[in-house]
């Protein structure tokens, strides 16, 4: 079991404990994407008006753009021995790291709920196939309890789940995918030309699918020896992210014709129909897939809550996160598709500038060990200003659409602007201070 104290999050991992095998980097970036989320995302592209070819292009471009910052962030863990939020205090300061850490905690709670809705739906169907019945709240509670226990035990148990449960899920979903494709007809051409605004919006959803892991990345590389090759870490992380997200989303494209709507209920019904008498295998895989993803969410959320300034034992943070995720999932179960797309897009508006600053500081700043700034730094101000302006001007969702997004016909470029503006602003300021 990982150390339960708040200090284990705020302080670097001792060198004696940095013994994690390097292959875990691949599994920790591969397994959390194994689930109906990627499938739903691929099917969602068809409902947005993309055909198969433009959908594949959006999937490849969006996932590569989203995965690169995550992979580069993963290499920060071994040298610092810190979680991703704690590592960002170099640029933001001890006080300045609290807003993004708190946002990340809320973000993890939301993903907890989003992931558990299809898993609980699958578990209910699985129980019905076995002659049992359970209400949604009970099925959800069973899954949330298992995920919470994994996060209570911490990093090492979470990593084991990613490797061994992830390998099992990979084989199962490959079989499901093959069966689904044999029962489906791909939408090879669109009934009307795909507008560039629609393509940008679709690409943005796909960028966020991978970029959303940026705030987790070094959480699961900090137990590697400090001497581990950064190039190897980046390569393994990139392979894991792209190797799971791209195939699953393309499967969603290929099987969209057999899915009534881009929702977990429709995906599950399609799986059951295609798999026939062994449909329970598909149901079990979907239910189990939430454990790989949400053990990540709950564990990282417990880290983030401590980084946000609530210095409670890690177990208390994990229990609080899982409990709130459960409540949100019960409350929002009937609005999955809209919640899913809005959540993917809205979270980008703070993650993009934050990770832009973190990467600019690490790769272009001075890595000489220095005391962590105790208060609010220039980097924290850049993060706050860029995030607010990005949301106010560029955001596109059912919640709010900014004036620039309206002028562009609904195209969403806010995350690109936020990332590059924050990174350049921070890097240029750091260079001018160094030269002076």
State where each predicted segment sits.
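Hydrophobic transmembrane alpha-helices that form the core helical bundles
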Residues: 97-131, 290-307
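Membrane-interface "cap" regions at the ends of multi-pass membrane proteins
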Residues: 1-53, 198-204, 222-232, 433-435
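C-terminal membrane-solvent junction of multi-pass transporters and transport-like membrane proteins
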Residues: 16, 355-428, 432, 436
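Hydrophobic alpha-helical segments and their helix-loop junctions in multi-pass secondary transporters
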Residues: 151, 167-192, 207-211, 251-258, ...
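Juxtamembrane transmembrane-helix boundary signature
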Residues: 59-92, 99-113, 427, 434
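Selective recognition of specific alpha-helical transmembrane segments in multi-pass small-molecule
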Residues: 35-38, 61-69, 104-115, 168-179, ...
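Transmembrane alpha-helical segments of multi-pass small-molecule transport proteins
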Residues: 101, 128-153, 167-178, 203-217, ...
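Membrane-water interface regions at transmembrane-helix termini and the short interhelical loops
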Residues: 47-48, 75, 99, 121-130, ...
